[in-house]
């Protein structure tokens, strides 16, 4: 039996993750009180069916260390993974505004506004986030994208095979929170200053031609590939389920997109399981 504990910020997609796990054949329990967790696990320990349990901020102990200690203890005896759903504050505020739902902490004595409730929840859940095995940030994802991401990460962990995620981003929109390695490529020649190239993206052939005409672009691409290749065997040996490499330029449209696509395709051609994402382009397409 495998157990996945699903937690995270309210509005970040816990219910979506639980539905995906249910579709994958997991027996799912929503908002199980933490004090029942150990006894529940004992009752299903002989089952051959995988189990997923979601833990809400409302039913965690006041001393969160009790929960993290319990989870660490359980990890030594069963196959347990913690899936944590995260999202930035602006996204959570927007989602609550659109759905008009009440945040679970909004009615507490410590919170009088949605803004305060989100801040308190982030503070309360920080220790749990720090011990998560799978951390997903749903800020720029649609329900479909998040569902696919959850399925991808869980299936990768079940296969015990490292999944390589390459994502481009724009620094002006903020750093990705789920990256293991971040490469800043803002020092490279910028196609943005070429009027004919400005409307294009790093996926277009003229941008590729422009960037590959500069030796420093090709050298950086080679060095990033070499760095990852060098450390990949140790990362795989460490039983990681995924490796996320983020490459950022100013706007996330040209340089970072080109390098992310090229490097992702390079490792895919070597036989690795690779997922390529262009976060800024995805965001613009939705708009």
Curated annotation (Swiss-Prot):
- SUPFAM superfamilies named in the record: P-loop containing nucleoside triphosphate hydrolases
Mind listing the GO molecular function terms for this protein? ATP binding; GTP binding
Q: Which UniProt keywords apply?
A: ATP-binding, GTP-binding, Nucleotide-binding
Where ATP binds, per the record, is at 8-15
Q: InterPro entries of this UniProt entry?
A: P-loop_NTPase, RapZ-like, RapZ-like_N, RapZ_C
Q: Which residues bind GTP?
A: 56-59
Question: What PANTHER family would the database entry show?
Answer: RNASE ADAPTER PROTEIN RAPZ
| Protein task | Displays ATPase and GTPase activities.
Family that this chain belongs to: Belongs to the RapZ-like family.
Q: What is this protein called?
A: Nucleotide-binding protein VV0445
**Protein species of origin:** Vibrio vulnificus (strain YJ016)
Classification of source organism: Bacteria, Pseudomonadati, Pseudomonadota, Gammaproteobacteria, Vibrionales
């Amino acid at each position: 039996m495998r157990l996945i504990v699903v937690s995270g910020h309210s509005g970040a997609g816990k219910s979506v993750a639980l539905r995906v796990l249910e579709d994958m054949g997991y027996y799912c329990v929503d908002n199980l009180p933490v004090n029942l967790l150990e006894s529940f696990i004992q009752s299903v320990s002989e089952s051959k069916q995988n189990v997923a349990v979601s833990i809400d901020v409302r039913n965690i102990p006041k001393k969160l260390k009790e929960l993290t200690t319990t989870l660490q203890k359980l990890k030594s005896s069963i196959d347990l993974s913690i899936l944590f759903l995260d999202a930035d504050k602006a996204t959570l505020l927007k989602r609550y505004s659109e759905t008009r739902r009440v945040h679970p902490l909004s009615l507490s004595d410590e919170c009088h506004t949605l803004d305060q409730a989100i801040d308190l929840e982030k503070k309360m859940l920080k220790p749990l986030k720090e011990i998560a095995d799978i951390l997903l940030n749903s800020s720029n994802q649609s329900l479909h994208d998040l569902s696919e991401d959850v399925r991808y990460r869980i299936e990768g962990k079940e296969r015990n095979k490292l999944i390589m995620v390459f994502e481009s981003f724009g620094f002006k929109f903020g750093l990705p929170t789920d990256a293991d390695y971040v490469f800043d490529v803002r020092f490279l020649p910028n196609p943005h200053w070429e009027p004919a190239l400005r409307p294009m993206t790093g996926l277009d052939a003229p941008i590729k031609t422009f960037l590959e005409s500069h030796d420093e672009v090709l050298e950086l691409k080679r060095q990033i590939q070499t760095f990852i290749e060098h450390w990949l065997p140790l990362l795989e040996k460490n039983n990681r389920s995924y490796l996320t490499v983020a490459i950022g330029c100013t706007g996330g449209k040209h340089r970072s997109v080109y390098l992310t696509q090229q490097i992702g395709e390079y490792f895919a051609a070597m036989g690795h399981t690779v997922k390529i994402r262009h976060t800024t382009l995805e965001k613009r397409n939705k708009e």
